[in-house]
From Swiss-Prot:
Residues 1-134 form the CID domain. The gene is cids-1. SUPFAM superfamilies: ENTH/VHS domain. Keywords: Coiled coil. It comes from Caenorhabditis briggsae. This is CID domain-containing protein 1. Gene3D superfamilies: 1.25.40.90, 6.10.250.2560. One of its GO terms (molecular function) is RNA polymerase II complex binding.
Length: 311
């Protein structure tokens, strides 16, 4: 196994194939380097977003699946940290409109739900993304703008955007007074001597009394510090969730805008055609003889004159 570098990671993801050996080998390498999971997840998601071939995206999703399933014992945190990226990748797949990707996502959700890889609520969120992918065909895509078919408004996207907006508002409300801005606890923690947080400075302890005093201070600071760190982690997760919800909201709003812009273009085109037809009708109407006008008071031709005209 080679040492971990971001370039090596990119190369391995680029060389993925649909063979199980390729998927498993790459997955094992990722699990071995789980300490670099933040880089792995970031590069994996970026690779998925840049890929426009359905088969390549499926391979990347299968690698994530193998990592998530095998990380339960090796590194559970890897599996949990991977979820926001997986959800974001599922949302991105809506733009591909590839049947093979849609089928692969459906299978993965079923497996994760059945084997309890992810929780019921997490699987539900993934199912919503999958459903959004199924229904995204109702919206115009860059490749199909001129297909001449009128797509119908998708109520699901509207509801999804509303839900995203509500989630964003909830996250923003929770982050109004985050732990990272709590000045009092920072001041309180800073009052403790450096000895309790820096093992190198323990050499300055001269006797048992100083050691006991230091231990007492350590016991006082530890619960406070653990609680603060816990709340900071929760804040970090909340910020990650906010970022995910914002990305989802932007995507849904863009899809909705694209749909309504096409709808406006279609209506304008029909309006122009109706106006042109109306002008043509008016022009034809004006050229018709006026049947209400008085007929000229001229004598009718005689039978003899009619027969002469026929000859």
């Amino acid at each position: 196994m080679s040492d971990f570098t971001e370039q090596t990671l990119r190369q391995k993801l680029a060389n993925l194939s649909n063979h199980s050996n390729s998927i498993q080998t790459t997955s094992s390498w990722l699990l071995k380097n789980h300490n670099n999971r933040e880089i792995i997840i970031r590069v994996w998601l970026k690779t998925v977003r840049k890929e426009n071939k359905g088969a390549k995206v499926v391979n990347l999703l299968y690698v994530a699946n193998d990592v998530a399933q095998n990380a339960r014992k090796a590194c559970p945190q890897f599996k949990d940290d991977f979820f926001p990226a997986i959800e974001s990748a599922f949302r991105h797949c809506c733009e591909l409109k590839a049947k093979e990707v849609e089928n692969a996502i459906g299978k993965l959700i079923h497996v994760w739900k059945e084997r309890q890889i992810y929780s019921q609520s997490q699987c539900k969120r993934l199912q919503e993304a999958h459903q959004q992918m199924k229904l995204s065909g109702s919206f115009p895509s860059p490749a199909g703008r001129n297909n001449g078919k009128n797509s119908q408004p998708n109520q699901f996207i509207v509801e999804e955007a509303k839900k995203n907006a509500q989630d964003v508002l909830v996250s923003l409300k929770r982050l109004q007074n985050p732990p990272s801005t709590e000045r009092d606890i920072r001041i309180q923690l800073s009052k403790y001597p450096d000895n309790i947080s820096c093992p190198e400075k323990l050499q300055s302890v001269q006797n048992s009394e100083e050691a006991k005093a230091l231990l007492t201070q350590n016991e006082e600071a530890l619960p406070m510090l653990e609680d603060y760190v816990k709340r900071l982690k929760e804040e970090t997760k909340e910020r990650e969730s906010l970022e995910t919800n914002l990305n989802m909201l932007i995507q849904n709003v863009r899809m909705s805008i694209e749909h309504h812009e096409k709808l406006c273009r279609d209506v304008k085109r029909k309006e122009d055609r109706i106006k042109a037809d109306l002008l043509e009708v008016e022009k034809t109407f004006e050229s018709l003889p006026d049947l209400t006008a008085e007929m000229p008071n001229a004598p009718l031709p005689t039978l003899e004159a009619l027969f002469q005209k026929r000859k």
